[in-house]
Amino acid sequence: MIKNKHHIISEIENLAHIYDLEYQSVGNEIKIYLDDTEIFIVLNKFIEIYENGLDKPHSFLELDKAIEKLQELIS
């Protein structure tokens, strides 16, 4: 189970700022807007990253691994 959701949300928001992307953060959910798609992130027991068009999320326990995946999707 992930801990310190506020820290995780802050780190993901910082990543969006670094890439100059628009995002929306509400509760334990973050949506990052790319040019032609969106990335939807949900914080529950895991950090779940949903790509547009995929039903099953990428799930991570570690923030570093989730950030790596987000960077891969963004760039």
Annotate each PLM feature.
Residues 37-65, 72-75:
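Intrinsically disordered, low-complexity regulatory segments enriched in Ser/Thr/Pro
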Residues 1-33, 54-68:
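Negatively charged, low-complexity tracts enriched in Asp/Glu with abundant Ser/Thr
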